[in-house]
């Protein structure tokens, strides 16, 4: 049986994080002092001056309704930022890149705890979006 040193497995992850491209951390926005509110029927995220971030961030949000509005107010200088929302049953109800100004709605989903996923790919700019029960 071949043994693999733990250090050898961790090295690529450490290098990626040092380069500012954390692929796995929910703290990827921490250096930019994000303001994140996840209250029943109201979710909001804002982070200013984000620079070259690649990450997937997941947030739980309680929606007592079956639909939601999604308001975009994001400024992108490079890269992409995408929001994907899944309902309490795991069905995808929304998937769109964040843009400077947009009022949008999700499709109908099951009430309960929804998942809001923010996918950043080499993103730089100011993130700002809100999701509210419709």
Which role does the model predict for each range below?
Residues 81, 119-134:
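Edge beta-strands of jelly-roll/beta-sandwich modules across compartments, strongly enriched
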Residues 66-72, 106-124:
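Noncatalytic modules at the cell exterior or secretory-pathway interfaces
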Residues 26-62:
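Transition segment at domain starts
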Residues 59, 102-108:
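Exposed aromatic-hydrophobic patches
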Residues 55-76:
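Short, surface-exposed binding/anchoring microloops in extracellular/periplasmic proteins
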Residues 78-95, 132:
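Short, surface-exposed beta-strand/strand-loop-strand elements in extracellular ectodomains
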